[in-house]
């Protein structure tokens, strides 16, 4: 079922890790831990397990960027299978809220990314129709989704030779929220010209569906290129999915409206008895407007707040989520579990406190509280085998796995963990300056991690006065600004970057051979064992990698990190010796900046200049068009990481202007 495409075979610790994990899965163990260093091939190990077991798979990642990287890698490993991407479809999202202290109501504001929305629908469709499906998702996986049984009822199939009146076919499409548009065929619409009906699926822009009629009979079905209308493939039959994941039929709408009105009566009675007339009026107006829209159009603004009734759930019953679309035997991989598990645990409480105010003050019915993410205990109730993956797994994962950890320490590339040196804080700035001169002589880059914003700024000014090519990354920087600074570091525009929390999971800077950690002995979230190990691991892409701890004494976290580092180095050195491997720095392409624009026309220019002439605004429009073109090209080439990066730039341009 799954066919793994790769030019290499498992090596290093990979064969043993694959075997250990496979044996535990076969023994029906539900919790497994894979502890792997950076560069040990954890994604390739996941791919081998997927291919071995031929089970539908969910891979969870704690942010969109890393999820997109995993998606791209798995898509390369499994080009003949369905690899899907399920994350939040909002480019911008501000949830509905009410602040009683200032009597401020904040309406929901969002900007939907249609491409991500289509990919979410594609994920649901694939899970319900194909077993050879891999879905890469973020925390969005535990948020509400439509009841899979009800959603599947909205699928309908057509076949060549089927007797079907065109008007009945149109009605079937409209019931599933397709809109007729004979002028511009956009996703989720259809056009009818003579005996030919063309449908633009809501779940993909790769093709359109052409259905040709002869009288009241379907004569031909084909998928075509949506732009030039050339034939892609002929079909004997075709399964058509809804245009909206919250498709509702008349029976459901009638039931929902009845149940909502019953709850409304009870709630209005409650407000009246408690002399809350403003809340009473507010709620009645809101709910009646929603129900009028639902009865007329089958959908309304904020329909998710009535999810309990749409799904047919009882009060307090857990919501349907992406997890309910998985078959019972599915595999679940939790990447960077030390970050992902706490994220899963935190979602419910934050959502609940916000919505409780909306209910208490008459903006929503109490049933809106059931439009929520899963609680962590509900997530735990799913019996899929869960494989936790991290360089630094937490106590939760280890305890769940009965203390058994499958380790991957050896890198097939032969690269070692960087050497760690501990130095006194005395004269540390002068010492760092000397190190920077050595780095420049080798044409290698440096990162410095501080603990305060003030010290970062002072250190940056000091090195600038010394003539160093240095940049400072801080929390005020937008996504594109951080990425651009790091790109310029790799390119050599900067030799040094200073910051507080630079080395987050997933950062990849092969040109950096020196990482300096100031105040390494200050036990804190950024200086505990897990954080230090993560930092050291991120500096392991260069064959001459080195980490310097500046400290007055060796803290417990420092000692544990140094011991961990020494053990990993010895294992890798022995492996390299046995296999004749000479470690070499990873060669990785440096992404180009936005093409065709000098600084005057760059993104920084448009964001930093508040007063803009008409000429400058025209240049801004030209830049936006160029960005959109590059984003589309990156998406078509399945370079989703770059596409998402370009999308973020567009959003930030829009916010500033």
Curated annotation (Swiss-Prot):
Q: Which residues form the Helicase C-terminal domain?
A: 428-581
Where does the UVR domain lie? 621-656
Domain named Helicase ATP-binding: which ranges?
A: 23-412
Q: Which Gene Ontology molecular function entries are recorded, alphabetically?
A: ATP binding; ATP hydrolysis activity; DNA binding; excinuclease ABC activity
Annotated S-S bridges: none
Which NCBIfam families does the UniProt entry name for this protein? PRK05298.1, uvrb
Q: What is this protein called?
A: UvrABC system protein B
| High-level lineage | Bacteria, Bacillati, Mycoplasmatota, Mycoplasmoidales, Metamycoplasmataceae
